[in-house]
């Protein structure tokens, strides 16, 4: 072994001066830095000689068969893998992620790279006498793990998680960070990508998100292509590396985004806010985790209540919202959510393009479920009587309709008023469900055969409440907030209340007239439309339209001081949340009056997010041209007070925000350049990020910037003090007889959130209180071990739980996983066999149509992408009844299968209705057929 290693050492010393521009070599720090850090993975190097490396360099990538140069060979003992680098598909990195083989050598330069340590390794270090170090995860030493193929563990032992050390909870920047702050790395422009670079730098300087990827990088696991979360993890690791590279190239992340969203292909300039939404949507989709919830069945319930209220008093409590629909419209203008299924599957059951809008609705529905349960459980909703009116008289005639839905307003649920005060139906908080470890095991009767029908979330009895799928991710934890809007009919005084989840606020920039209305509406009882900036930008008639355009053009060319008072961010917020009269062409359809009525719409925030993203609507796209509103909007660097926009019954404690970063656009609507100003969290200084250039700037420079997107973070000195107190306790390390396991994700919240919420250990526990089998292989990435005194302090301060002293693989989940895996395999094999037989038929007599929406759910289940089987077959969206016959709806999203395949799926899942297509039968006259045969014979004879 020593001799073989000597070959590599001598060879490496010869070729080290040869340095090529390779993707992985961009990550290689200087040589002295590498020598100062010992790599604990050198003991895994197998025996290899110079001749072996030369022979491998003449070969090809074992996956894509591309030839060198710059192939990478795995150095793991008994592994002969050779893969391509980042100049191609980067199969070498994929191999390392899948096998946890960390050491690889470039067969052209013979330089060695360790994926786990994220640094260059010199093999002559292994020849020394220094003992090997145990592998301990450092705070910023990230290990890129991918999702392994699902295998049921054969044993019930778990790796012992690490004990939390002082660095795990320390939030103070050390002296080295203050002198040479990390995170000051630029991003190279790779073809009009300044919009992406500015957006990435703004997100990179959001500590809750970046710290999640740096400290919980092992949780960036997904089997969904193109694995944006892994590319983002890699980028954050490079940007915040202690070696402080001058700039990096975000090629992998950009290629992944372009694969999913065609908008960003090519080299044209794009919108930074659109890129932000697309990126965060993809990260949520890949990182989301399911949390089981219990919900009333039926889903749509209406409550009858009376409201005889003083209208003026109602106006006092609610300012109007031109509306929450502003953000809806902005979102729709920028395109639908961008998701994609894995296009590289070896077996596509039915070739069909993924319906991105449906997937968008699915996620919006998931996020809706997240916020519904959080809002209702904490009692902040409670029909919001006080927020609507302080004088409410109840009788049995009038109605308050409570709606809860997502931003797209696609999924609406009306809630019983008596349910709103029934906490046992919903969990006590979003992150903690006290029944997760106390619930009885799921039914073991999980499809023992093909005969019994299986229905999703099937209840044992009609009276049982059904389980509803709820999802959360680090994205929703950080950026999701809730708006409560209310529409009051001015005829019958009926009030309809709606909860909407938002990830950013798209604020209008009020003009001079709008500012005058906002500032003059100091009397809250007057019903005045005082913030409908949309009206100012949508005049009726061509003459007014042209004059408005000329006016805005002149305004954009003349300094803002010439036109009147300075517009502040508070003005934009007031315009967004202002009272909105619904009249004229915009009358309210009252469900009680059954007519169009005049109404008033109010809007306030029920829950503020940890990081508030504010988008200023500077770009307006007219019929034939686009314009940019260049009005300067002043914004505070610290102390943004959002108390005036908070709902009265909101449980929010912290409503003050400090600025983290701001994205600016210089230029016109058709061309321009994006930069970002960001505050470094380690030294609290402001920097300008202009592609690969990073420059320190003053606070006044930031305040004078033309803001387009702003990121604000909740400010809490109390949270800072609490973190320091816990860090000091951890540094003392009192001896204790018991050790407690705690979620890494929650610890990240504790370190970076102003309001971390109750402790939640449910991300590594199943509903039975054990570790799910699929998480057993990487449990050390999910938990840390705390001494008893630290746990006691955290638990007494934040509550939650459950307390965990012992980790074990859940036997019940293991049995269920084996059953469900067997079911997947059987259903998939039978479908493939039946579908192949169907494809061989030349002219089938009948076709059975099936909803592609349902089929995609079933396909995700049998391929292991979704843990739950779909519900009954639902063909109602593709079927239409004419003259008593069920026919295929024109343009329906449907697929064609054989009768045998339909019977197979229907026998398992049930549902319907049957939609049958019968190809028309062409009757041929025998005389004509005989004449054609005669002509054919004569032709052949010639």
Curated annotation (Swiss-Prot):
This is Ubiquitin carboxyl-terminal hydrolase 33. Gene3D superfamilies: Cysteine proteinases, DUSP-like, Zinc/RING finger domain, C3HC4 (zinc finger). The active site is at residues 194, 673. Zn(2+) 2 binds at residues 61, 64, 84, 91. Deubiquitinating enzyme involved in various processes such as centrosome duplication, cellular migration and beta-2 adrenergic receptor/ADRB2 recycling. Involved in regulation of centrosome duplication by mediating deubiquitination of CCP110 in S and G2/M phase, leading to stabilize CCP110 during the period which centrioles duplicate and elongate. Involved in cell migration via its interaction with intracellular domain of ROBO1, leading to regulate the Slit signaling. Its EC number is 3.4.19.12. It comes from Homo sapiens. Belongs to the peptidase C19 family. USP20/USP33 subfamily. Widely expressed. Residues 717-810, 818-921 form the DUSP domain. The keyword Zinc applies. The gene is USP33. Residues 294-357, 419-469 are annotated as: Disordered. Interacts with VHL, leading to its ubiquitination and subsequent degradation. Interacts with ARRB1 and ARRB2. Interacts with ADRB2. Interacts with DIO2. Interacts with ROBO1. Interacts with SELENBP1; in a selenium-dependent manner. Interacts with CCP110. The keyword Isomerase does not apply. It is an enzyme of class 3 (hydrolase). Residues 453-469 have a biased composition (Basic residues). Pfam families: DUSP, UCH, zf-UBP. It catalyses: Thiol-dependent hydrolysis of ester, thioester, amide, peptide and isopeptide bonds formed by the C-terminal Gly of ubiquitin (a 76-residue protein attached to proteins as an intracellular targeting signal). GO terms for biological process: axon guidance; cell migration; cellular response to starvation; centrosome duplication; endocytosis; negative regulation of protein binding; nervous system development; positive regulation of protein binding. The modification Phosphoserine is found at residues 377, 439.
């Amino acid at each position: 072994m020593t001799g073989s290693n000597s070959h590599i050492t001598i060879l490496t010393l010869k070729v080290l001066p040869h340095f090529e521009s390779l993707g992985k070599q961009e990550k290689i720090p200087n040589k002295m830095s590498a020598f100062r850090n010992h790599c604990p993975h050198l003991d895994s190097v197998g025996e290899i000689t110079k001749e072996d490396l030369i022979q491998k360099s003449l070969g090809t990538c074992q996956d894509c068969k591309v030839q060198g140069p710059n192939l990478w060979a795995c150095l793991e003992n008994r592994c002969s893998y050779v893969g391509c680098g980042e100049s191609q598909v980067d199969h070498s990195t994929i191999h390392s992620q899948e096998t946890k083989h960390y050491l690889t050598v470039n067969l052209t330069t013979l330089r060695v790279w360790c994926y786990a340590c994220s640094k260059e390794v010199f093999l002559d270090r292994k020849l020394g006498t220094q003992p090997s170090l145990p592998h301990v995860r450092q705070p910023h030493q990230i290990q890129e793990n991918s999702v392994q193929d699902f295998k049921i563990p054969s044993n019930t032992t778990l790796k012992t998680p690490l004990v939390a050390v002082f660095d795990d909870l320390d939030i103070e920047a050390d002296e080295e960070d203050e002198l040479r702050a990390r995170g000051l790395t630029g991003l190279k422009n790779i073809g009009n990508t300044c919009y992406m670079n500015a957006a990435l730098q703004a997100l990179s300087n959001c500590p809750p998100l970046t710290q999640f990827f740096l400290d919980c990088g092992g949780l960036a696991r997904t089997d969904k292509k193109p694995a944006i979360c892994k590319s983002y993890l890699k980028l954050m690791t490079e940007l915040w590396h202690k070696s402080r590279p001058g700039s990096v190239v975000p090629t992998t992340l950009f290629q992944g985004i372009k694969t999913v969203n065609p908008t960003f292909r090519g080299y044209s300039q794009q919108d930074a806010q659109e890129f932000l939404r697309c990126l965060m949507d993809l990260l949520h989709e890949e990182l989301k985790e399911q949390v089981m919830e219990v919900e009333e069945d039926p889903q749509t319930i209406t409550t009858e209540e009376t409201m005889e209220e003083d209208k003026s008093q109602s106006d006092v409590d609610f300012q109007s919202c031109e509306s929450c629909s502003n953000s809806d419209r902005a979102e729709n203008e920028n395109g639908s959510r961008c998701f994609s299924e894995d296009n590289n599957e070896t077996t596509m059951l039915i070739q069909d393009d993924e319906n991105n809008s449906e997937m968008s609705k699915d996620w919006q529905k998931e996020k809706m479920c997240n916020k519904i349960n959080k809002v209702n459980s904490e009692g902040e909703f409670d029909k919001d009587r006080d927020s609507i009116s302080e004088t409410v008289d109840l009788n049995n005639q009038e109605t308050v309709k409570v709606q809860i839905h997502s931003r797209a307003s696609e999924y609406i649920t009306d809630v019983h008023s008596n349910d709103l005060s029934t906490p046992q139906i919903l969990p006590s908080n979003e992150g903690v469900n006290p029944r997760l470890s106390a619930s009885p095991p799921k039914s073991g009767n999980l499809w023992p055969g093909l005969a019994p029908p299986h229905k999703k979330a099937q209840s044992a009895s009609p009276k049982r409440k059904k389980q509803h799928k709820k999802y959360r991710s680090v994205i929703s934890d950080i950026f999701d907030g809730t708006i409560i809007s209310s529409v009051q009919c001015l005829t019958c005084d009926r009030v309809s209340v709606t909860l909407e989840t938002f990830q950013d606020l798209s604020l209008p920039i009020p003009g001079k007239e709008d500012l005058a209305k906002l500032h003059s509406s100091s009397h809250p009882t007057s019903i005045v439309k005082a913030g409908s900036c949309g009206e100012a930008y949508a005049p009726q008639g061509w003459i007014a339209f042209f004059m408005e355009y000329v006016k805005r053009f002149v305004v954009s060319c003349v300094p803002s001081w010439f036109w009147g008072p300075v517009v502040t961010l508070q003005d934009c917020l007031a315009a967004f949340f202002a009272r909105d009269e619904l009249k004229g062409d915009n009358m309210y359809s009252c469900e009680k009056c059954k007519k169009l009525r005049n109404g008033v719409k109010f809007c306030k925030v029920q829950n503020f997010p940890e990081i508030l993203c504010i988008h200023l609507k500077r770009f307006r796209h007219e019929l034939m041209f686009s314009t940019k509103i260049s009005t300067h909007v002043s914004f505070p660097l610290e102390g943004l007070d959002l108390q005036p926009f908070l709902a009265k019954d909101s449980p929010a404690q912290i409503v003050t925000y400090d600025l983290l970063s701001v994205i600016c656009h210089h230029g016109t609507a058709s061309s321009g350049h994006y930069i970002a100003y960001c505050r470094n969290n380690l030294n609290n200084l402001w920097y300008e990020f202009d592609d690969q250039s990073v420059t320190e700037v003053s606070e006044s420079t930031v305040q004078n910037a033309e803001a387009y997107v702003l990121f604000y973070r909740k400010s809490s000195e109390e949270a800072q003090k609490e973190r320091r107190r816990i860090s000091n306790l951890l540094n003392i390390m009192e001896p204790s007889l018991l050790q407690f396991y705690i979620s890494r994700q929650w610890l990240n919240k504790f370190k970076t959130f102003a309001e971390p919420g109750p402790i939640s250990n449910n991300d590594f526990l199943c509903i039975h209180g054990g570790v799910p089998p699929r998480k057993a292989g990487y449990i050390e990435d999910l938990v840390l071990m705390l001494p008893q005194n630290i746990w006691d302090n955290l638990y007494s301060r934040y509550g939650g739980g459950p307390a965990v002293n012992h980790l074990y693989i859940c036997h019940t989940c293991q049995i269920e996983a084996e059953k469900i895996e067997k079911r997947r395999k059987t259903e998939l094999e039978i479908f493939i066999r039946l579908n192949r037989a169907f494809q061989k038929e030349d002219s089938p007599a009948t076709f059975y149509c099936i909803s592609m929406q349902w089929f995609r759910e079933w396909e995700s289940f049998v391929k292991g992408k979704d843990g739950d089987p779909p519900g009954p077959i639902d063909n109602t969206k593709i079927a239409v009844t004419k003259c008593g016959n069920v026919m295929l709806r024109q343009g329906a999203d449907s697929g064609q299968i054989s009768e045998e395949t339909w019977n197979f799926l229907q026998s398992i899942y049930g549902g319907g209705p049957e939609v049958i297509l019968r190809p028309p039968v062409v009757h041929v006259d025998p005389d004509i057929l005989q004449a054609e045969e005669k002509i054919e014979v004569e032709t052949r004879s010639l």
